[in-house]
Regions:
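N-terminal beta1-alpha1 cap of cysteine-dependent amidohydrolase-like domains
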Residues: 1-233
Length: 234
């Protein structure tokens, strides 16, 4: 996209000013699977790398997003035609949760090639805390239902930070948090009990303007009257 050109130029200048031994270009790219032919296609990545080179950037590492494992044949093809080492072709396949990604990247050797490229002394990584977090995330002891009251719930990323915070808090307490999104515009005295009677807690998300304000006030009233724990974010 034309919007990314200033950022790519900034990266090029950083590489030029700091030198290749003090910088590293990691190119995240998609390896699509074509159902019709039953194969993963590397051509889009080859074109992407070529376009980067035309802008003065050479990828040191390819991180290849795919929905399945990349064979050594595909990795060799990418290494040959994209002019990177075989070990620098890193697969990033779909995982159960985004928090699996650091472990997968370590298994693929991304940490080692990064340290090697930047000439940083290699030490044994300690990911015990991260693995413990993953274990608690995937093995909750019980579940709770939290209502998220907002006016932008149709946009999945509008309350991303709140949703991620609930994941972190739930994991720390070994609880799976089921989030029920409720549009504040559609809350009234007739349906509020039906929408919220199964909630263990309520979060009223921030929003600008008068639209949906009455619904938020009703949600707070419901929480106070029924002694449901609630948090209002302004």
């Amino acid at each position: 996209d034309i919007e990314s050109l200033p950022f790519l130029e900034a990266v090029r200048q950083v590489v030029y000013e700091e030198g290749p031994e003090n910088s590293m270009v990691i190119h995240l790219t998609l390896i699509p699977f074509l159902t019709a032919t039953g194969e993963l296609k590397t051509k889009p990545t080859q074109h992407s790398v070529k376009t980067l080179m035309e802008l003065g950037l050479k990828a040191d590492v390819l991180v290849c997003r795919a929905d399945r494992e990349l064979s050594d044949e595909i990795k060799n093809k990418l290494a040959l035609f994209c002019n990177v080492k075989f070990d620098c072709v890193i697969q990033s396949i779909d995982v159960e949760t985004i928090y699996d990604v650091p472990i997968k990247m370590m298994e693929e050797g991304l940490d080692k090639v990064t340290l090697e490229k930047l000439k940083i002394k290699e030490t044994e990584p300690n990911l015990d805390k991260w693995k413990n977090f993953l274990h608690k995330l995937k093995n909750p002891t019980h579940q709770i239902n939290i209502g998220l009251i907002g006016k932008y719930i149709e946009l999945s990323d509008s309350y991303k930070s709140i949703l991620e915070s609930l994941i972190h808090a739930g994991t720390e307490n070994e609880v799976k948090v089921n989030v029920k999104s409720i549009h504040s515009e559609y809350i009234d005295r007739e349906n509020i009990g039906k929408d919220m009677n199964d909630l263990d807690g309520i979060i009223v998300a921030p929003g600008f303007g008068q639209r949906g304000l009455d619904g938020k006030i009703l949600a707070v009233e419901y929480a106070r009257v029924n002694k449901v724990p609630f948090l209002v974010i302004c």
